[in-house]
Amino acid sequence: NEIVLKLADEHRNVFVVGDSDQSVYAFRGADIRNILEFEKAFPDTSVVILNQNYRSTQVILDAANSVISNNFGRKPKDLWTDKTTGEKIVLYRADDEVDEAAWIIGEVQRLHQHGTLRWSDVAIFYRANAQSRILEERLASASIPYRVVGGTRFYDRREVKDALAYLRAVVNPSDEVSIKRVLNVPKRGVGDSSVARLDQYALAHGVSFREALANWPEAGISGPAKKGLANFTELIGQLSQRASDGPAELLQTALERSGYLEELRDERSIEAEGRLENLAELIGSAEPFETCDEFLEQVSLVSPTDDLDDQSEVTLMTLHTAKGLEFPLVFIVGMEDGIFPSFMSLGDPDQL
């Protein structure tokens, strides 16, 4: 801001385009005061308010005006359009996220069956990626094709795959793929060479990888990997003794004792916070199931629909990703305190 003031001090030749009602790049250092207080710095400014909207219906604009009018210190501005009034906004008060997802899928199916819209006409917005889990499950169960824009499908996310691999490694000792996935997650000093030695031992002795892992001292493992393998085998042994605790508790225990959650907490980044939210969502989704087998069977059923050329798909994305896009039918989920807006923004009016 100071650089602009110095450059324009003599000729006052500054042209600025902005929106005084939003500051979506505050996390990158943008300051909304540069817009709100611009006329103080340049009293001779000519202001042109662009308040005609060419995309939305008046119903949507009225709702937006109603919300945005509560902004502190804003410049008065009412959006309008010459388009038709449009459909009314529908508010559905759901009991929880399961009820919410069921209602959305029901509405989408109803409108699609009536021939009034294609799958690609529908978009579902959420604040955090973790919220997509229940939506993906319900869409897959209803055989509705979908895509996740600007992100990865819930069960394809790295941390979710890691957590499920721990669970599968405990429940199924012969699941070599899952064991190898988490053998060095978090890092235990077990590299590819150590895994190769275990593979060679298993092949030479005609045993499974899990059995080779249990006999790692005989496989010629050396260096830091010795401690890492000892800790891992001890962890899997402890978790196996608690397999009857149920999937939710076993997941929580595995992630805590392995140090996985601690590593994410110590990272203190937005990405790590998102991964923690995804893991919390996964653990919560496992609570209704009594056994790990039942839960893992349900997870295996939530698989992506077959890809087809030019296939029409329902779109799932965060609100941030959705900026500038248009859809005939939009659902916004999780409109509740602590989620929308985030609980981290509630104490700061500027964040709201």
What positions do the PLM features span?
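Conserved helicase NTPase motor core
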Residues: N1-E37, Q52-S56, A254
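Short glycine-/polar-rich loops that comprise or flank the Walker A/P-loop
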Residues: E10-N13, D19-D21, F42-S46, T84-I89, ...
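A short beta-strand-to-loop transition that corresponds to the Sensor-1 phosphate-sensing loop
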Residues: G18-D21, R28-I32, Q52-Y54, A64-N65, ...
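Short alpha-helix plus adjacent loop in nuclease-associated cores
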Residues: D21-A26, R55-S56, V148-V171, L183
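Switch/connector loops and helix/strand junctions flanking conserved nucleotide-binding motifs
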Residues: S23-A26, S56-D62, S69-N70, P76-K77, ...
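Flexible beta-alpha connector loops of hexameric P-loop NTPases
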Residues: V24-R28, V48, Y92-R93, M344-L352
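Helicase P-loop NTPase motor core
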Residues: P43-S46, N51-P145, R168-P173, R242
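Conserved helicase C-terminal RecA-like lobe
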Residues: S132-I144, R157, L164-L352
